[in-house]
A protein has these predicted regions:
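Hydrophobic transmembrane alpha-helices and their helix-loop junctions in integral membrane proteins
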Residues: 1-203
Length: 203
């Protein structure tokens, strides 16, 4: 992420909208790929790993949107998109670390990674369950936690985009808003399944 930002804003001779469009499209495709694969995982660590791919895609989409706005001299929207992207990077580092600690605790206690063989751990591991609930709600993007704030700010960056004097960019940004909303909804489903099966389901 840092390298892409430095190359895009410091090493390239000028900010190019097409480069932002490429990053935006690749980021959205990566996010969709990650969340779809996370939804079908039965291994809890693989599920979190694909969720990380989804969130990295969101970060690249945010960087791409920032570059597009900068290329068309939309300074306020570029600042909003960049702030949302960096905040989401910080958020992801926090709640994903927490969730990997939770899965590590579950694995250490049960010697089991398969979601189909876990369940009902709220009774035997209440502290881990409550910490896992915080991480799950944050990564699912539910208010008022940090994951909601960063994803909402990024979605606002898409929604408040004015008409841009470039046809492809004008088409890509509304599609990007729809894909981001769909990815966020699927991510919420994935994380509710993750938490519900491990801590609330029948063993």
């Amino acid at each position: 992420i840092y390298g892409v930002l430095r190359v895009s804003f410091d090493l390239l001779p000028a900010v190019q909208w097409w480069w932002g469009g490429v990053l935006l499209a690749l980021g959205l495709a990566t996010a969709a790929f990650g969340v779809v694969y996370a939804a079908v995982q039965s291994d809890m660590k693989r599920l979190l790993a694909y969720s990380s791919i989804e969130n990295i895609g969101i970060l690249y989409a945010g960087i791409g949107l920032t570059i597009v706005f900068s290329a068309f001299e939309l300074g306020a929207l570029a600042a909003l998109a960049l702030a949302a992207t960096l905040y989401h990077a910080l958020n992801h580092a926090c709640f994903k670390s927490l969730l990997f600690l939770v899965t590590g605790s579950v694995l250490h206690a049960t010697r089991e990674r398969s979601l189909g063989r876990l369940g009902g751990l709220m009774r035997s591991m209440p502290w881990v369950a409550w910490l896992g609930l915080v991480g799950t709600l944050a990564i699912a993007g539910l208010p008022p936690l940090n994951g909601f704030v960063s994803e909402w700010l990024l979605l606002q960056s898409f929604l408040f985009t004015p008409t841009i004097p470039q046809t492809f960019a004008n088409m890509l940004i509304p599609v990007g808003a729809a894909v981001l909303a769909l990815v966020a909804a699927l991510a919420a489903y994935v994380m509710v399944k993750f938490y519900g099966v491990i801590f609330l389901g029948q063993p």
